[in-house]
C-alpha cells in the first residue's frame, strides 16, 4: 500500500479526552474516530489490526475444535425471559421494539440464543461434545464508558459456548478453552494470566479471567510472581489428550482478581518476595455454568440409556476490540506504538528519504514490488513529507520493520533497517532485507 493513497488521519496533538496511553495513541495514529460515548469507527489502520487479532483468535478456536457460526446482534426478549435474565441484567441492556411492537434487545452476550439453537437441532448424546463460537459486535450500555476501546459500549467479542452430557465433559471443554486462550494471547505478544474470578451475571461456580498486567488496568489482581514465567503450550498441543497437567501447572500458583482474593491464603501460600499486587486488563474470561441455561430453557438430549439428560454448558469470551488497546498498553514507548509482528497493520514500511530523487525513487519502487511479490504486507511512504516527519509517523503507527532508503546508503548499495521493537539498526542490501522478510512470511 502506498501511503499517498492510504487514509491515515494522524493527529499532531494529544486528544484531551484520552486518559490512557492506548486511547491516546489509537486516536493520534488515525486508528479510531469516536462517534459517541464508548462507540468508535474503526479507520483503515485500526481495522487492519482488528482483523489480524480476530484471525489469531479464530485460528486458535478452530485448533481447539470449536466451530464457527454467526448469530445476529438483535435478540428476542422472550428468550431472555425464559432464562430469567431479562429483568436481572439491568440498565446495561439496550432494549428496543420493532414496528410490530415486538420486544428485542441488542445482544450483550449470547447464552440464550445459542441454547435455543442447540435445543432446536441437537437431540442425542451422539452429537456431543459440541463447541460453537462466533465473533460479533456486542453492546452494553456502560454508565461511564472511558479509556477508549478498553471500556466501550460497543465492542467486538469472540464468544464460544460448549455443550456436554455431564460435568466431566464440560470441564474437559473448559480446559480446552483455557489452553487455547494461553496460546491466543501469547501469539499477540501478551502474557494473559488466568486468574480465579467471579462469575457475575453469566453465572456458574467456576471462572477464570485472563489478565494482562498493566497499571492502567481496571482490575485489581494478586498473584505469585512465578506465574509470569510459566511456559505457553506449543502449537502441537493435543486438545484431545489429557490437558490436566497444563491446567494444574497454571492453577497451582496463586492468581486471583480482587473480587475473589483471599488475603490469608495469599500470605500463607506465597513468599513475601514473590507477592504481586497490581492492576491488570481483562482480555478474556471463561465460565463453567453447568445447567444454568439448559435447565430453564429445557436443552435436553437423549442419553445412552434413552433417558433425557439436561446438558452442561460453558461460555468463553475474548474481547477482540479491547485486545487492540491492551497490546498498545503493553507495547509502546514515548514515540508511539510498537506492534508485535502478528498483529501489526503492516509488517514493514519503506521510507523514501529523498522523494523525487531518481535513484531513491527507483530503489523504493523496486523494493516495494519485490516485497509485495514475496507476500510481505508493506506500506510505502511515498509522500512529500520531510524525513523527520516520516520517521515520526513510522514510529507512531508502530510498523515492526522500517526500511530507510536514502542517497548515502544507496551509493554503497545498502538501505538502513530499523526494528521498531528495540530500535536496533542495521545496514543491509535491498536483496537481503527482501529475503529476510520474505522468509518470515513463508514461515508464517
UniProtKB/Swiss-Prot annotation:
Keywords: Aminoacyl-tRNA synthetase, ATP-binding, Cytoplasm, Ligase, Nucleotide-binding, Protein biosynthesis. GO terms for biological process: prolyl-tRNA aminoacylation. It is an enzyme of class 6 (ligase). One of its GO terms (molecular function) is proline-tRNA ligase activity. InterPro entries: aa-tRNA-synt_IIb, aa-tRNA-synth_II, aa-tRNA-synth_II/BPL/LPL, Anticodon-bd, Anticodon-bd_dom_sf, Pro-tRNA-ligase_IIa, Pro-tRNA-synth_IIa_bac-type, Pro-tRNA_synthetase. It catalyses: tRNA(Pro) + L-proline + ATP = L-prolyl-tRNA(Pro) + AMP + diphosphate. SUPFAM superfamilies: Class II aaRS ABD-related, Class II aaRS and biotin synthetases. NCBIfam families: PRK12325.1, proS_fam_II. Belongs to the class-II aminoacyl-tRNA synthetase family. ProS type 2 subfamily. This is Proline--tRNA ligase. It comes from Bradyrhizobium sp. (strain ORS 278). The lineage of its organism: Bacteria, Pseudomonadati, Pseudomonadota, Alphaproteobacteria, Hyphomicrobiales.
